[in-house]
Amino acid sequence: MTKRVRLSDSFNPVYPYEDESTSQHPFINPGFISPNGFTQSPDGVLTLKCLTPLTTTGGSLQLKVGGGLTVDDTDGTLQENIGTTTPLVKTGHSIGLSLGAGLGTDENKLCTKLGKGLTFNSNNICIDDNINTLWTGINPTEANCQMMDSSESNDCKLILTLVKTGALVTAFVYVIGVSNNFNMLTTYRNINFTAELFFDSAGNLLTSLSSLKTPLNHKSGQNMATGAITNAKSFMPSTTAYPFNNNSREKENYIYGTCHYTASDHTAFPIDISVMLNQRAIRADTSYCIRITWSWNTGDAPEGQTSATTLVTSPFTFYYIREDD
């Protein structure tokens, strides 16, 4: 027979059954209390068992909330509490990104909008076409220029490259003969031929008026870019530096130089070049013009034979002040 523990004389039989002499609780649960969800802490004091995120700190059952959450003081609802700084924006319960010019979304991904002349290359943005260059291409497959008055069709190739560099344009030009009449010029002692280029106010070549019959375009690799250019004004000779119809400043509109023709016997014949910028317009819709004249006057013709030899001039480079964009 097991002996029962004898309670002290100071034991208080009223819950929580405290022993007044020792202030100890005898770990006695009243019969009407289930331990599920409750605990004694300290002994004899009934409390709730709380697991995170619940807590009774402060005396009442509460919900622990971390950063970004709050409990509404009015209706007690749990709400998000997130602020944003630019360029993030908050609309309702959603966070978005404020997009400026040049940015967009594609398949829910932030992306850069690229305009004409730009492309991606190995995730880097690069210039698709060289918009600082305007040219005929390296060597056109067919004759693109008609210089001789007697010609009824294109008689030579004009290779022209215009490159913007700061306030200047660098021009690179030479000629390759195609027709027999044009190449026969090499058998004359005194000749000249001129390429006239007329442009509208946007810098587009007026092919119906010009010696060059194919439009200029930007450079794309070693080829001409596809599609028409919209504005090439910045490649044009400045009308301030090279005005039209100003006789007092006419000499400022000319550039002079020399290139060569190499004859069949390898003799280099000098060719005089003169470039006239603007100065004279032949029609009201002509806003800019470039005239390039090649000439020679020698004691002997470059080619003594009567059969034509392809007339190829050496390249000539000149510079001029360009028009503003």
Curated annotation (Swiss-Prot):
Origin: domain of life: Viruses
Stored InterPro entries: Adeno_fibre (IPR000931), Adeno_fibre_knob (IPR000978), Adenobir_fibre_prot_rpt/shaft (IPR000939), Adenovirus_pIV-like_att (IPR008982), Attachment_protein_shaft_sf (IPR009013)
Keyword Ribosomal protein recorded: no
GO biological process, one term: symbiont entry into host cell
Gene3D superfamilies, per database record: Adenovirus pIV-related, attachment domain (2.60.90.10), reovirus attachment protein sigma1, domain 1 (2.10.25.20)
Subcellular location: Virion; Host nucleus
Pfam family, one: Adeno_shaft
Key word S-adenosyl-L-methionine present: no
Protein keywords: Capsid protein, Host nucleus, Host-virus interaction, Late protein, Viral attachment to host adhesion receptor, Viral attachment to host cell, Virion, Virus entry into host cell
One Gene Ontology cellular component annotation held by this UniProt entry: viral capsid
UniProt xrefs under CDD domains: RBP-H (cd07964)
Upregulation: Expressed in the late phase of the viral replicative cycle.
Family to which the UniProt record says this protein belongs: Belongs to the adenoviridae fiber family.
Subunit structure: Homotrimer. Interacts with host receptor CD46. Interacts (via N-terminal tail region) with pentons.
Domain comment, as recorded: The tail region anchors the fiber to penton base capsomers, whereas the shaft, built from several repeated motifs, allows the knob to protrude from the virion.
Miscellaneous comment as given in the Swiss-Prot or TrEMBL entry: All late proteins expressed from the major late promoter are produced by alternative splicing and alternative polyadenylation of the same gene giving rise to non-overlapping ORFs. A leader sequence is present in the N-terminus of all these mRNAs and is recognized by the viral shutoff protein to provide expression although conventional translation via ribosome scanning from the cap has been shut off in the host cell.
Function summary: Forms spikes that protrude from each vertex of the icosahedral capsid. Interacts with host receptor CD46 to provide virion initial attachment to target cell. Fiber proteins are shed during virus entry, when virus is still at the cell surface.
Protein name: Fiber protein
Organism: Human adenovirus B serotype 11 (strain BC34) (HAdV-11)
Lineage per the UniProt record: Viruses, Varidnaviria, Bamfordvirae, Preplasmiviricota, Tectiliviricetes
